[in-house]
Design a protein with these regions (language model features):
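N-terminal hydrophobic/helix-forming segments and targeting peptides
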Residues: 1-467
Length: 467
């Protein structure tokens, strides 16, 4: 006959109470703080997906990765990579087991909500010059007014050459901004819905006000702006039609809070998962299964296009590895496991009504796992099997990695999607997880250093796992 337990003993045995990782593990704060320093440097040097790809390639080359050769048979331990159209990164470490026994993938994205310049962006109005923009991804437009902005991009010139540039990041650079009305004249604007407080057609970036010295020149301010750009970059107005230019916040990544426990920056979504995923891949040595880290593009607008996960570039890479080695790619896909690493909304006490507290995910409790994403009735979700959730959480528990599980917000309020379904459509088992973010999709998002570090730990143990 079993011993009868007290109610308190039953509670300790049966109930599940999530804990804050830094409270549970004494050394976590110190390790997380140290890890965060490298992350902040990455964030400041990778404001766009192109820049993130460049910085990632530099890290990979420094770690000994070689450019992928499609028909080569690779040996265990070799490290290869390729860059997809300058905007996405694929890096792999060849494992001890045949490809047919499965790959281990970690996929994050390096595009972020932003403002793109239109094909014909430059105009003058009342002695001021502006760029017209087209917002990219799910931005709350009013958040982009009256903040310092930087302009990053690439021009493809008439002779076929390209020039990359970034203005507004160096402390000696000028910055740019989108103006707003003063409250004294804002009565009509105040009657607008919040979503229309600043409209898309009003997201015009102020870039100049000086004129050329000669008289009788039309659009003298616009011309003066073009002369300055031509003198520095050798471009003409027509070159804007074959350019990719992004407007991003000019702010650097900064510690947040008296205790410095958090980081505020533009682009945590999803570079807070991309950076630790890449670092975990770089540090992987002689894995059992071949590991693949993907830093993809276009997630914020549906993963379409040649650099998005609805393209085949990642899956072609896997197939090419298999075919060169004379192995079956279908078996390889069926035996593979993927972590879809994307951020989620951290429970925000200031906006508690938007969340269901019991199933929220919290800053500081570790990496957040999502069995499913989607919106309302799980629309567009990849719903992971319970067995896969069990496999991953047991792996994390065995390695003392702090994790939590939940959903994003109230059921009927909205939702969100990830790249998971595009991977699952190829017959690959996939689980969503990532770092919780406060003020997600804003120009200054906030994350907890502990969660960043636990993301790194998660990807590291996954890459080295045998099952």
């Amino acid at each position: 006959m079993s011993e009868k337990l007290t109610a308190k003993e039953y509670a300790e045995k049966l109930l599940y109470t999530p804990e804050y990782a830094a409270d549970k593990q004494a050394d976590v704060k110190e390790k997380a703080a140290a890890f965060a320093e490298g992350y902040k440097k990455f964030m400041d040097s990778a404001k766009t997906e192109r820049e993130a790809a460049v910085v990632s390639e530099q890290m990979l080359l420094a770690a000994g990765y070689k450019a992928f050769e499609p028909k080569k048979v690779y040996a265990p331990g070799e490290k290869v990579y390729f860059i997809q159209e300058n905007k996405a990164v694929v890096a792999a470490t060849i494992g001890q087991k045949p490809y047919e026994e499965g790959f281990r993938l970690v996929i994050a994205h390096i595009d972020c909500p932003r403002l793109d310049l239109r094909p014909n962006p430059l105009y003058e109005s009342d002695h001021m010059s502006y760029f017209r923009t087209h917002y990219y991804g799910g931005v709350r437009k009013y958040q982009w007014a009256t903040i310092p902005l930087a302009i990053h991009g690439v021009f493809t010139r008439a002779d076929g050459s390209s020039v990359n540039f970034a203005i507004g990041e160096d402390e000696n650079d000028p910055v740019f901004c989108i103006t707003d009305l003063l409250p004294h004249l804002g009565a009509e604007q105040n009657e607008r819905k919040l979503s229309e407080g600043i409209k898309g057609e009003e997201l015009n970036v102020l870039i100049g006000s000086d004129t050329v010295e000669e008289e009788d020149v039309k659009e003298a301010v616009k011309l003066n702006t073009l002369i300055l750009l031509n003198q520095k970059y050798g471009i003409t107005e027509r070159d804007f039609t074959r350019a990719e230019i992004e407007v991003v916040p000019a702010a650097k990544a900064r510690d947040v809070g008296f205790d410095r426990s958090m980081i505020g920056a533009y682009g945590h979504d999803d570079r807070v998962d991309a950076y630790p995923a890449l670092l975990a891949e770089i540090e992987t040595k002689d894995p059992v299964h071949t590991t693949i880290c993907v830093l993809t593009d276009k997630e914020e607008i549906g993963s379409d296009g040649v650099t998005g996960m609805q393209s085949m570039y990642v899956f072609h890479f896997m197939q090419l590895l298999c075919h060169a080695a004379g192995q079956d790619d279908i078996l390889a896909f069926r035996n593979s496991v993927c972590l879809s690493a994307d951020v989620t909304a951290a429970y925000d006490p200031s906006w508690a009504s938007a969340f269901e507290k019991q199933n929220g995910t919290y800053a500081g409790r570790g990496i957040a796992i999502f069995k499913y994403t989607g919106s309302r009735g799980k629309s567009s979700a990849s719903d992971a099997n319970a067995e896969l959730v069990g496999d991953i959480t047991r792996m994390l528990d065995a390695n003392n990695v702090a994790w939590q599980i939940g959903e994003m917000g109230r059921l009927d309020l909205g939702g969100g999607g990830t790249i998971a379904k595009y991977v699952a459509n190829r017959g690959i088992k996939v689980l969503d997880l990532g770092v919780p973010v406060l003020s997600m999709h804003s120009p200054f998002e906030v994350i907890h250093k502990t969660d960043l570090y636990m993301a790194y730990r998660t990807f590291s143990v996954f890459c080295q796992s045998a099952d």
